Regions:
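Small beta-barrel nucleic-acid-binding modules, primarily SNase/OB-fold domains
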Residues: 2-179
């Protein structure tokens, strides 16, 4: 009987710890900081541009493929797919920006990898967000938003301005993104 009492008491204590002890009618909502998911910036070195939204960068001596978070550029290297409108310009711009950069940094925000094993990150070039530069010039659309990323609002503002001016992909969106 003593063992049963200990098990029951342990169960009740565990239940109280899990649910919390609150007066009736009190609602509980955990405080979650969006900032907590955003990492500190890490220095990277340019290795190779894959296309407009993907590059190989070296971090702490190891080379990784980075997919730029929250943007999509027209295709240039997708198998069995022709180069899309503005795809080459987006790729050339990314390569140029990364190649001439004095300082490249990466910053994680949420999931660190995608389903293909590529690293997902914000890419900073000489203190400026590369994704925002791509969007401002009309080389990329804001895309693949899976949650509240730190710089999404900045990108959406830049996208609205680029659309309004019909820059880059916004001149012929269906040719840039035919699917």
């Amino acid at each position: 009987m003593n063992k049963l009492r200990k098990v029951t008491l342990s169960f009740i204590l565990s239940l109280l710890l899990i649910t919390g002890v609150m007066p009736a009618g009190t609602t509980y909502s955990p405080v979650v900081s969006v900032e907590a998911a955003v990492s500190k910036k890490q220095t990277a070195k340019f290795v190779k541009a894959v296309d407009g939204d993907t590059a190989k960068l070296s971090v702490k001596g190891r080379t990784y493929t980075f997919r730029f978070l929250a943007v999509d550029t027209p295709e240039t290297v997708k198998p069995n797919t022709p180069v899309a409108f503005m795809g080459k310009r987006a790729s050339d711009y990314t390569k140029s920006e990364l190649k001439k950069a004095k300082k490249i940094q990466i910053q994680y925000d949420g999931n660190k990898t995608d389903k293909y094993g590529r690293k997902l990150a914000w890419i900073w070039v000489d203190g400026k967000l590369l994704q925002d530069k791509l969007v401002k010039k009309g080389y990329a659309r804001v895309y693949y938003i899976y949650g509240k990323y730190k710089y999404t609002d900045t990108l959406k503002t830049s996208e609205r301005k680029a659309k309004k001016k019909k820059l880059g992909i916004w001149k012929n969106y269906s040719a840039a993104f035919p699917d």
